[in-house]
Amino acid sequence: MDAPRINKWLKPLSALYGVGVRLRNYLFDKNVLISNSFDIPIVCVGNITIGGTGKTPHVEYLIRLLHPRYRVAVVSRGYKRKTKGMIVATEGSTAWDIGDEPRQIKRKYPDLTVIVDADRSRAIGYLCDLAEEQRPQLIVLDDGFQHRKVKADLNIVLTDYNRILTKDYLLPAGRLREPAGSIQRADMVILTKCPDDLAPIDLRAAKRDLALYPHQKLFFSKFLYGQGLKPLFSDQSPSAEVRSALAIAGIASPKLFFREIRTRFPSGTDRIYPDHHEFTDREICLLIQDWHELHRKDANAIVVCTEKDAMRLALRQSSFPQEMQERFYYLPVEVKLMFDQEKVFVDRLLGVIQHKK
């Protein structure tokens, strides 16, 4: 666990921001501001920090657990999309239409209902009004912990093992959207990106630091990169002789991604961009230059990006030379609960669904 970096010069602004956040939460807690309830069970997957907890892989984990048995819909804001209003995603929807994360989910689960709308209540109302045979039996609210206009039946909050929540600071000095104590609104907390060698003393330290109530269940998850590389533009698999890679990441916390890439491909170049980054023409040109330089040294060199970046880079296919397209891959990531916690986790989810039947 690492202590977060805090910009001490911005602490006065964080104090002002905190006043506004606490007032808003107080008004919701006292029912001055109203949270809307719905007939369909809603599971919210959110966080208290600004990104970096692995939210989308955890949403996909819920889908894998429940979608075979229940009609599941995902409602998301559609961050950084270029459209407005409510959009029901189709297989042809792009990252510009619905955002990179909803596009990633829809691409993996084409028969899943995915809706993007800044007004999450409107999107959920639309789903509730569908005919019974189309109406979802469960709604996963993506990144909705601060969207208190919707009353979720189960709030799951994610927090990064590598960034101690209780030692972080409110925006803009730190990365907290709201005070760390707000985690007490959660029903379940998942400590994400845990190392494989997590020891009992680490578990006790995490429980102590988070100071959860007895009714709040704490889970531990880790990232898995076992699927292998997927081609982005072609159908060619990488050669077994590949030792070099140009690695591209525009996500909030790319450390685990780069560590995995360098474990597989020891040499190459790493390029880091902001989360949800929209690549400019100049940046694409620089990536092409990086590729040519690497390819001159190693004829088998490849390009690898994160799965989320692939949703945006796919829109720039024509900008890349053909030879680079044929060696362009992305690395999917999945999550797994540790310490045989999956049954307890699933039972809690099923309890929420059964309660509203």
UniProtKB/Swiss-Prot annotation:
GO terms for cellular component: plasma membrane. One of its GO terms (molecular function) is tetraacyldisaccharide 4'-kinase activity. Its EC number is 2.7.1.130. It catalyses: a lipid A disaccharide + ATP = a lipid IVA + ADP + H(+). GO terms for biological process: lipid A biosynthetic process; lipopolysaccharide core region biosynthetic process. Keywords: ATP-binding, Kinase, Lipid A biosynthesis, Lipid biosynthesis, Lipid metabolism, Nucleotide-binding, Transferase. HAMAP family: LpxK. This is Tetraacyldisaccharide 4'-kinase. It comes from Porphyromonas gingivalis (strain ATCC BAA-308 / W83).
